[in-house]
Amino acid sequence: KNESIGIKYWDTSGSNNWARPATLNTELNGAYLNNYATIAQNMIGNAKYYLGGYNGSNVTADTIYQYERKISGGGTYYYGTNPNSWVGKVALMYLSDYGYAASEECTKTLSNYNDLTCISNNWLFDKNYQWVLFQNPYRRYTVYRVVPDGNYGNLNVYENLYNVRPTLYLTSSVKI
């Protein structure tokens, strides 16, 4: 969704485990999804969402993508016993989605996306804080968000209300 459905906490109990489920997961796959007619709900398919994370900066969208899916060369991807994926209907955009949404002219690492070339040509850029589906693997209560200047950072899941832009996948039978 290219607009926020409002500002919300990622999780009110202080866990970065989306599959537990996190407060935001419960809301998106409950009240938010139930606002749509049954015919629309049936167009949304179950999808596998990857829950990997990273603790650091100066990385590209490609590197973030690999950590989300645990396909990079090594490192810590998840906090404790957090699962590496979750199957469901509605989640948040990946941090790599945000990185890939910038035009080819943006050659910066994601922590330097506050560059005008990166934000002016990124259709997912919004001048507001927005949650993404990306955890800090070293702290059970920390996830990432995109910040108003265009780059990203991590924050405790229960401290701030940020914008939520739901992500979903349509079933293969949907005709557009």
Sequence positions of predicted segments:
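Collagenous Gly-X-Y triple-helix signature in extracellular proteins
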Residues: 1-176
